């Protein structure tokens, strides 16, 4: 019987306060996160941004216990999935590849080679595909695989996205229903989906399918929820976690919360739709920051749906994904990372800083200049900002 390696790809997160700076550096060193015209500046810019953001980010992690639980939860998911697959008769072993913190993809590849894996199934722990999440992880894996003659021989199948998988939808409905049942008027509870945002240009200029998949997913969940409960609930979708000067997907979560408060919404069921495990954006951004905004807006009951973590129905769905991937049409690593064709005035492969026709580029260029000036001053210890007493 073939030895199957199931590779679960995720973001990663700092486990201790001292990890925050290096984690941010790894994050912003990724050109899928920040696109600049000259690659030589990528790492200096990443160092600058991570240095400037470290203190604030450390405070956020301190508020949830001093570190991210994402590794612990992902390891639990991997163990549960491995057990489920073996119960179904597969000789499967799960591995974890984090993009920006330990255990990195290189470590997972080394472990699979040492274990003599015969074929690999790759599942990103992002239900919806995006350039900056699954896409970045797929491309990192491809780069490492292409440079490893031994690992390159191992057959590999990939799951690109899985937001419409039946058990995933069912598990989301089960968790949402739990919170709705706690409301005084369940049919009036407002379902508030909040997804991690991406820059608008990713969708409009590069063809990222993320926005469409998020919208489709939220409607699928609402339809299944209505079947389960026997009534429909009002619902809204928003996007959170934007950073930088460019425009991100709208509407923004904090703005929608204020609008819902003005509309006299009392019971709000917050659904973190793009996260399958608890981490900084659920535990701190939603549970602390957005809850405070909601309460200030007059929303009386703010209820956040738990992340899927190791929900049994969710783990069952992941196991079915693995089996379907093994039995279905081959999707290789190259295909998994591809973007759909889009008609535009410039080549899609040249979609990067300075090549699209959006005014956001100019905002980005200005920000780039500011970052570089600040970087030079931090290194040199002199300049106009020092003379003004800003630095």
Swiss-Prot record:
Pathway: Porphyrin-containing compound metabolism; protoheme biosynthesis; protoheme from protoporphyrin-IX: step 1/1. Belongs to the ferrochelatase family. SUPFAM superfamilies: Chelatase (SSF53800), Chlorophyll a-b binding protein (SSF103511). The keyword Transmembrane does not apply. It is found in: Cytoplasm. Its EC number is 4.98.1.1. Catalyzes the ferrous insertion into protoporphyrin IX. CDD domains: Ferrochelatase_C (cd00419), Ferrochelatase_N (cd03411). Its main location: cytoplasm. This is Ferrochelatase. Pfam families: Ferrochelatase. GO terms for molecular function: ferrochelatase activity; metal ion binding. One of its GO terms (biological process) is heme biosynthetic process. Coiled coil: none annotated. GO terms for cellular component: cytoplasm. The keyword Lyase applies. The gene is hemH. Keywords: Cytoplasm, Heme biosynthesis, Iron, Lyase, Metal-binding, Porphyrin biosynthesis. It catalyses: heme b + 2 H(+) = protoporphyrin IX + Fe(2+). It comes from Prochlorococcus marinus (strain MIT 9215). It is an enzyme of class 4 (lyase).
